[in-house]
Amino acid sequence: MARIAGVNLPSNKHVNIALTAIYGIGNTTARKICSDLQIPPFIKLKDLEDIKLDELRESVSKLIVEGDLRREISMNIKRLIDLGSYRGLRHRRGLPVRGQRTKTNARTRKGPRKAIGAK
């Protein structure tokens, strides 16, 4: 198992799939990293040479991933809440932020239904 950005990557998977195990790297970014470093995307991570693995580590270290990205996202949400903006208010109340309807279909964001006592 290769360790990149503090994450143990599965060595039996293809390089571009294994890179998506890092928070903040999706399919598109993984493919771009592979093409920039001229790594065939369908080679297994365990078959990768140490030199290429070091280049991969260096390339990923230039991106904002894992803890730094999580911290940045939470700071952005905290900033919206502190500003008192509409989006911050929706975050604080645990409701959908981007204009979705809430009369129906907001169960994921609102959580399970709260029972109203019978009379």
Curated annotation (Swiss-Prot):
GO BP of this protein: translation
Biased composition (Basic residues): 94-113
UniProt xrefs under InterPro entries: Rbsml_uS13_C, Ribosomal_uS13, Ribosomal_uS13-like_H2TH, Ribosomal_uS13_bac-type, Ribosomal_uS13_CS
Segments for region (Disordered): 94-119
Record's keyword annotation contains RNA-binding: yes
Keyword tRNA-binding attached: yes
Leader sequence residues: none
SUBUNIT field: Part of the 30S ribosomal subunit. Forms a loose heterodimer with protein S19. Forms two bridges to the 50S subunit in the 70S ribosome.
PANTHER family per record: 30S RIBOSOMAL PROTEIN S13/40S RIBOSOMAL PROTEIN S18, SMALL RIBOSOMAL SUBUNIT PROTEIN US13M
NCBIfam families: uS13_bact
Protein name, entry field: Small ribosomal subunit protein uS13
Species per Swiss-Prot/TrEMBL record: Nitrosomonas europaea (strain ATCC 19718 / CIP 103999 / KCTC 2705 / NBRC 14298)
